[in-house]
């Protein structure tokens, strides 16, 4: 096991606990800590591997599912005020209305214009993406938004966003792992191989025991990926490159096969609900773009981070946008958007369209494989990023030093990787938490807000510091990012906000009773 980190003197020595909360760590100190031989990670990633990490994180199975839902629109009733959207409650309160109307949710159909929705959402995400690109090239450290906040906003904000990122990565991957388990179980059943429910379904669901012993497929996929990540980042990146290539190949095959089945009359009317349908469609598909920020967690393993991190972040966004727009144009040309309102057509629109229009079994099988690769690569990248967040927080002494241990042979943060694996694998084997999936979304948006704010602050505090990539039109572009992400946060439900606040309060208690006392700044002050 690697030796414990040497605690070096931070940029400043806060004279009080209050000053410590807002003390920023210098960028030079952050970089020098990363070069400590006892904690140095192996630099093996180039621009394609970084771009593939972004694509692997962004494109899951959603491209094969949400396109139809957003095109067809949806209408449902929330079971209680806790499941109402915060924005709806605010608007309704200002109008002086009752709560009944707030519980009724409706999104008009975007129809074929969902292609425009994908394009507009990509532009919205690019504002945050540009901010990540500037800070990632300027502060090439594994902690992503956590590290950027430590350098710009202070220790307490760094802790909050680090704790928030843990929530984002854990919840997201638990949900994906459970989805993978259910998907692989269904696919095996189609070949006559039935996995016993007691070993392939959640133990606890909707507040009661199910009679299952353990969701073994969900746990197994996380365990296998954890072993791969411990073995080395080069091996993990190569595996991700292969899965991304298969995933992109599956999408391209769909575009070719589906393109031959397009009936142009299905594109009329192009925008059945006008601009409102385009906007609400964008709200549904926005979260299919989340994941590009995970590229920044690979900063310390990139061969040329100043050049390649912006390429990975922006390149993955561009490639995914082209694929999303292409799939939406072809899918909505194959069948009328009203087809995808309910049933199998709503659950798996791409597979449904191929099957009902007589596509051969090979094309349908490719889509199944593409969806599986999408889930596995997403799991891999987020598990990778999660371990790097914990590693960075441990190196700053906000987490126990054990988390920043680096394997002597593989040069990976193996302890953090194993802990991250079990933190996801065990809950995935026991619980069904799909209703908590929005916790990942609110955590991501919160990180986007702080990173965008960090760009503005660093431009003011260190305007002459070299930047390999610069966000244009500062502060306007970062401000647009803050407004858009903040607005999307209000579109989430009340229960999501409550859970998010409870998680942050729990994190603050840990900070007060442990992290604050072990921080480098505290030791310097002492």
Where are these regions (language model features)?
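Membrane-interface "cap" regions at the ends of multi-pass membrane proteins
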Residues: 2-111, 130, 141-142, 464, ...
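Select transmembrane alpha-helical segments in multipass membrane proteins
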Residues: 43-54, 113-116, 154-167, 217-221, ...
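Extracellular loop-to-transmembrane helix junctions
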Residues: 63-206, 316-319, 326, 503-508
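C-terminal membrane-solvent junction of multi-pass transporters and transport-like membrane proteins
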Residues: 210-214, 272, 402-414, 448-497, ...
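TM-loop-TM module centered on a large, flexible mid-protein loop between adjacent transmembrane helices
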Residues: 77-109, 147-148, 154, 186-197, ...
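Membrane-helix boundary/coupling elements in multi-pass transport proteins
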Residues: 64-67, 127, 141, 164-182, ...
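Helix-loop-helix junctions that connect adjacent transmembrane segments
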Residues: 26, 32, 36-42, 82, ...
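Hydrophobic alpha-helical segments of multi-pass membrane transport proteins
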Residues: 186, 251-254, 390, 440-467, ...
């Amino acid at each position: 096991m690697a030796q414990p980190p040497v605690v070096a003197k931070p940029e400043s020595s806060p004279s009080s606990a209050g000053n410590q909360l807002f003390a920023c760590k210098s960028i030079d100190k952050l970089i020098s800590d990363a070069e400590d031989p006892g904690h140095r990670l192996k630099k093996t990633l180039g621009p394609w591997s970084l771009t593939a990490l972004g694509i692997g994180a962004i494109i899951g199975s959603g491209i094969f599912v949400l396109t139809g839902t957003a095109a067809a629109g949806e209408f449902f009733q929330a079971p209680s005020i806790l499941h109402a959207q915060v924005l709806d409650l605010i608007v309704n309160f200002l109008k002086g209305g009752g709560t009944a109307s707030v519980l009724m949710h409706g999104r008009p159909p975007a129809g074929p214009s969902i292609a425009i929705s994908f394009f507009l959402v990509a532009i919205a995400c690019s504002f945050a993406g540009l901010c990540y690109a500037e800070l990632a090239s300027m502060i090439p450290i594994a902690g992503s938004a956590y590290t950027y906040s430590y350098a710009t906003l202070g220790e307490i904000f760094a802790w909050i966003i680090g704790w928030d990122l843990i929530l984002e990565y854990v919840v997201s991957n638990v949900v994906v792992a459970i989805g993978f388990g259910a998907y692989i179980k269904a696919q095996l059943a189609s070949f006559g191989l039935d996995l016993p429910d007691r070993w392939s379904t959640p133990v606890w669901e909707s507040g009661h025991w199910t009679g299952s012993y353990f969701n073994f497929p969900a746990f197994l996929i996380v365990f296998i990926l954890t072993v791969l990540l411990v073995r080395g980042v080069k091996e993990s990146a190569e595996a991700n490159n292969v899965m991304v290539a298969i995933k992109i190949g599956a999408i391209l095959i769909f575009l070719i096969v589906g393109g031959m089945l397009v009936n142009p009359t299905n594109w009329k009317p192009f925008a059945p609900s006008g601009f409102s349908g385009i906007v609400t469609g964008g709200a549904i598909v926005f979260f299919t773009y989340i994941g590009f920020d995970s590229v920044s967690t690979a900063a310390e393993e990139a061969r040329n981070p100043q050049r390649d991190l912006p390429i990975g972040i922006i390149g993955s966004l561009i490639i995914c946008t082209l694929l999303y727009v292409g799939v939406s144009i072809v899918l909505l040309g194959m069948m009328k958007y009203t087809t995808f309102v309910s049933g199998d057509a709503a659950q798996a629109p791409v597979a449904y369209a191929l099957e009902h229009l007589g596509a051969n079994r090979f094309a349908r099988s490719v889509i199944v494989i593409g969806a599986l690769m999408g889930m596995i690569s997403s799991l891999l990248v987020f598990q990778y990023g999660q371990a790097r967040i914990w590693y960075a927080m441990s190196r700053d002494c906000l987490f126990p030093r054990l988390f920043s241990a680096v394997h002597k042979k593989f040069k990976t943060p193996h302890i953090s990787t194993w802990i991250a694996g079990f933190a996801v694998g065990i809950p995935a084997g026991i619980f069904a938490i799909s209703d908590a999936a929005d916790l990942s979304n609110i955590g991501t948006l919160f990180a986007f807000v702080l990173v965008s704010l960090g760009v503005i602050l660093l431009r003011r505090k260190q305007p002459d510091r070299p930047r390999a990539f610069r966000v244009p039109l500062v502060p306007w572009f970062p401000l647009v990012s803050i407004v858009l992400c903040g607005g999307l946060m209000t579109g989430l439900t009340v229960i999501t906000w409550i859970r998010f606040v409870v998680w942050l309060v729990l994190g603050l208690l840990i900070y007060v009773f442990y992290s604050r006392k072990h921080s480098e700044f505290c030791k310097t002050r002492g």
